[in-house]
Amino acid sequence: MLRFSVADHIFELAMGAMCRPVPCPRNFRPFVTTEEGEPLFRVRLDAEVEARADEPLQTFDYELQMGDCTLAIYADEYRLTIRSAGEATIVCPFVERGETAEYRTNLFAEGKQPNSVMFDHALCFAYSFAALPHKTLLIHSSVIEKDGRGVMCLGESGTGKSTHTQLWLDHIEGTTRLNDDGPVVRVLESGEVRVYGSPWSGKGAVYRAEWRPIAGFLRLSQAPENRIQKLGRIGAFGALLPSTLPTLQKEERTLDQICGALSEMIVSVPAYALACLPDAAAAHLSYTTIFGV
């Protein structure tokens, strides 16, 4: 068994076969923990997953960069099937807040060795599903940090999120990346909103078990000139929602939890829309606006 901590939520991975070690890919190693306490969820990695006789309430098909998935939604659980050089299903039951969720997957059943796409996506989904009731969301973005605070660059795929944070790195002194694809945002009981590094960072491969308070959300779009404006709460909500996990927006319970968490985030953190060119001036414009310098 191995224990991990992401955004201060602990989870465990285990094998039923004692002779098989629990995998710990490079992107998960910074998040290994010896911290005690009841975990948010556990995943049995080599479990048997039998097909259900009843039909799901709804299904949702989507593609990955190296495969495809089917999400089946039932009244008592989600089942995500991932196909990429093989096929595996992870089963995530609904549990009451405060209970440890017991998940199971056949990723490693019968001696199988799944590729990194299957392993990462299964664990990303399991974590997102379990953390959602705790006002914790994985938000598709690239995060730059400056002076101890993070800026989350949001936008559609191909908009230039990583390009914009790279411009900060190149032209604004004292900046570093916290994550380049899948950071985790959590609303604490105090109302503070933090962004955390995670094992899911895309091609940028930035795996840091650290957190920062958020200075601002920045929704990017491409334009022939650089313009920035601060968004009201409705605009801020609309800027963030598309960057949350689409698989958790398909059912009323999880969508309500997403909307509740986002509503608290935009009360505490300002959001901006940046229409921009991929140039140094755009980076300086967003930096000076958000940090007020």
Feature locations, PLM:
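Hydrophobic positions on the alpha1 helix immediately C-terminal to the Walker A/P-loop
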Residues: H164
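A noncatalytic interaction/capping subdomain that flanks phosphate/NTP-handling catalytic cores
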Residues: M1-M152, E156-S157, L167-T176, V184-V293
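Conserved lysine of the Walker
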Residues: K161
